[in-house]
Amino acid sequence: MPGTPSLYAAIDLGSNSFHMLVVREVAGSIQTLTRVKRKVRLAAGLGADNALSADAMERGWQCLRLFAERLQDIPPSQIRVVATATLRLATNADVFVARAQEILGCPVQVIAGEEEARLIYQGVAHTTGGADRRLVVDIGGASTELVTGTGARATSLFSLPMGCVTFLERFFTDRSLTQEHFASAEQAARDILQPVIAQLRGQGWKICVGASGTVQALQEIMMAQGMDERITLAKLQQLKARAIHCGRLEELEIEGLTLERALVFPSGLAILIAIFSELEIECMTLAGGALREGLVYGMLHLAVDQDIRNRTLKNIQRRFMVDIAQAGRVAQLAERFAVSVEREWALDDLSRALLHSASLLHEVGLAVDFKRAPQHAAYLVNNLDLPGFTPAQKKLLATLLLNQTGTVDLPALQQQNAVPLRVAERLCRLLRLAIIFASRRRDDMLPDVTLTAHDDTLTASLPQDWLSVHPLGAEMLEQEQLWQSYVHWQLDVK
């Protein structure tokens, strides 16, 4: 049976989990159709002689039988299957790989550590915003990849022999979570890091992103607990203290930590603490993609877009038939307003960039219906895949769109954690006013309005007689003053 030409599949035979990603290309990006993940814990089957046990191999083959059914619909030339650290180490890897290829009907490539690091970096570069120099950290089941680079180009690639499964079996064998066990795991990780620290520091970076299950788990924990999404050493130490307090792995309970991730969380946490300490990392955020995305984008031969957020915004505007000219007017006004109050209101570049993004998407809900358009817009943004935006940033965008007009939902603004609450409130106010002043949908009808701020009092100064000449606009502003006053936001119009 012929395959579907537009489909691509990437399979990652990892040391902890096997993953399958099936996508199709849409407008220079990828649309995910299927994600399948199974905890195989292949690394746990490595014996002292580095031979894989029969049980571990059978767990892997059983998982691949599930994957094989889906691969029947995809041309073999559009499938890539790679195996990583455990199968690099296993003395009987050829036995596992030969049977795996029979099951899948396509080649399985055991890739070197540096190639794994390169693919991880490509996946990050294609899916994670920012043009600055970056450090990418991926803690796998049996290896940890550390990569520095700028844009599409990796400048240093390292694959180190430490992972959350191998460290679990080595340092938490009895499943007790003690200070001593953590200390031993952290010291071992520091020792492994020593030969590469100088070169990594020499490359330097401005942003650090994590692309592993450990970092995903941390993100889920922080979101569940209402913290901001920035991972810091202080937060890692707090989580370690919580784990030690729980005492045993089977009793590990941390709000936001799923049962599926709990088993290898302490060992991954110990490795990450060592990385933060040795490389003096200030903060880390979650990457948008990693190895599997790197494989897919490699098959598609797509160039890395230096402005991933802009590509994402344009794709959404096109998909939902947004009036691009009107979105641009609102974005232009919102930026003008932000510039006029940025010093008084301490709006940084990221906050202004997120305001710009919200402005460009504010009418996306009209594609569903005019009624409840802000709610539709918020739902869409919350649930769409937005490469270049972190989960917390997506939530902020959705919250701003929800509050673009009408009664202000203050609890929704309080629940986002991408920016401080006061900043979120201020971005909301600027967006609402930009939408009002651009409501005539014509460039020549944009008023020469000036915004000034003093603490939380916002003053809109309009040309003489503007209010009398534009009675509908005056009424909209009067209503907006009321809505803002309900949440104790002072808006003066003169």
Swiss-Prot record:
It catalyses: guanosine 3'-diphosphate 5'-triphosphate + H2O = guanosine 3',5'-bis(diphosphate) + phosphate + H(+). GO terms for molecular function: guanosine-5'-triphosphate,3'-diphosphate diphosphatase activity. Its EC number is 3.6.1.40. This is Guanosine-5'-triphosphate,3'-diphosphate pyrophosphatase. It comes from Cronobacter sakazakii (strain ATCC BAA-894). NCBIfam families: PRK11031.1. It comes from the Bacteria. Keywords: Hydrolase. Belongs to the GppA/Ppx family. GppA subfamily. The keyword DNA repair does not apply. One of its GO terms (biological process) is nucleobase-containing small molecule interconversion. Pathway: Purine metabolism; ppGpp biosynthesis; ppGpp from GTP: step 2/2. The keyword Hydrolase applies. It is an enzyme of class 3 (hydrolase). Pfam families: Ppx-GppA, Ppx-GppA_III. Catalyzes the conversion of pppGpp to ppGpp. Guanosine pentaphosphate (pppGpp) is a cytoplasmic signaling molecule which together with ppGpp controls the 'stringent response', an adaptive process that allows bacteria to respond to amino acid starvation, resulting in the coordinated regulation of numerous cellular activities.
